[in-house]
Amino acid sequence: MNKQSILVLGFVFFLVVIIETSVAGNEKKIIPPLYVPGLGEIMNNNVQPHHIKLNLSGQFNNWPLALYELDELREAFNAVKQYQGTWNGKKIAEMLPAFTDTYFTVIEKAIKEKDTKKFKNAYAQLTNACNACHQANDRSFIVIKIPESSPFSNQEFEPIKTN
């Protein structure tokens, strides 16, 4: 073994000893994540884009994409529940379903039935529920609306045409 190999092995051994020493006796401690996204960050970067994409998918009758975006929207709300336990003393996991679950079910039914009219109505109801949640939580200045255009110029929302 050359000097460099011995130094590397010695350094690795040193790190293992330090890590083992610092972890010993702390097995039951849960180490918090280094980064936890804030509520506004999740809403702006996850919920809102999928809310928009869900609408665009439905407008173009791209039902597979609409179902995918609905699932992504559900995941985004689950992230809110996971990372933000409470908001102004209210438990988010208990509060959100009252504003979302019914509308998610109605939208999913419209998507599976490929019913554009039902989809538009359900999407409008979901959007209204978003605003009702904001109002109930002293955030009435955040008003969500049905998108008038797509901010996603790099994504096609029309279904793929097959021959």
What feature does the model see in each segment?
Residues 76-95:
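Short, solvent-exposed, charged loop/turn and helix-capping segments
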Residues 23-67, 157-163:
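Immediate post-signal-peptide N-terminus of mature secreted/exported proteins
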Residues 60-62, 111-118:
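Short helix-adjacent coil turns
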Residues 9-18:
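Bacterial N-terminal signal peptides
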Residues 1-10:
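Bacterial N-terminal signal peptides that target proteins for export
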Residues 126-137:
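The canonical Cys-X-X-Cys-His
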Residues 65-66, 73, 119:
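Solenoid-repeat scaffolds in large eukaryotic assemblies
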